[in-house]
């Protein structure tokens, strides 16, 4: 049976910026946007911590500023003596201390640097998969035909996906989500829809699987699929 893996690097541009600053991409409030332009500029990426406040991945900068302002108004009402004692862009610190003001980092885009990191990650995939079996869908997403490799490595598709994702995390600090399917479509849908509904592991990794039967059971009536 054919087996395909789709891997998406989590909030890639934002994660690269966090790692460059020695920060945890899953715990840091950061957007990638050129603040030298107007606040109507589009954010190229938003970290998961900031998305939890309802900010979409491609928000305009003024939407981020407005959301943060509203969150801080709520936090101020709950803060001791209704005043802030400081600010933080770290989700864990904000959760522990209600007297901290929500802050975020705005990182100027570095497209050439993102390409370098993407290439480095692609080279990690090449340790396990031949280039003809890797389709680069975008700077942060690939499709892999793993069919001919499972017997070679004596592993399941999920084990192979997890091994590659773990090495990417260890060497770049960037985590990922993966979908596994018996065709490219099912792998993509498993990643985009099913993986979002399952709990992440300790590294923020989610891996979901779909075959024709489980697709009918879970998603036959699901809309939209893209």
Where are these regions (language model features)?
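Gly/Gly-Pro- and Ser/Thr-rich, intrinsically disordered tail segments characteristic of DNA damage-repair
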Residues: 1-226
């Amino acid at each position: 049976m054919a087996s395909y893996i789709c891997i998406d690097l989590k909030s890639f541009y934002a994660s690269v910026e966090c790692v460059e600053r020695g920060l945890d991409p899953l715990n840091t409030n950061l957007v990638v946007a050129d603040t030298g332009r107007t606040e109507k500029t589009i954010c190229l990426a938003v970290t998961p911590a900031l998305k939890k406040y309802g900010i979409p991945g491609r928000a305009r900068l003024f939407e981020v500023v407005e959301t943060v302002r509203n969150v801080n108004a709520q936090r101020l009402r709950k803060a001791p003596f209704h005043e802030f004692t400081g600010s933080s862009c770290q989700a864990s610190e904000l959760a522990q201390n209600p007297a901290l003001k929500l802050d975020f980092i705005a990182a100027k885009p570095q497209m050439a640097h993102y390409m370098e990191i993407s290439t480095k990650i692609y080279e990690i995939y090449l340790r396990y998969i031949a280039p003809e079996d890797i389709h680069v869908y975008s700077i942060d997403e690939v499709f892999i035909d793993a069919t001919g490799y499972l017997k070679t490595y004596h592993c399941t598709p999920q084990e192979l996906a997890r091994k590659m994702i773990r090495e990417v995390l260890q060497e770049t600090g960037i985590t990922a989500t993966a979908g596994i399917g018996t065709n490219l479509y099912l792998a993509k849908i498993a990643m985009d829809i099913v993986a979002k509904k399952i709990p992440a592991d300790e590294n923020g990794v989610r891996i979901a699987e779909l075959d024709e039967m489980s697709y009918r059971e879970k998603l036959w009536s699901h809309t939209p699929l893209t």
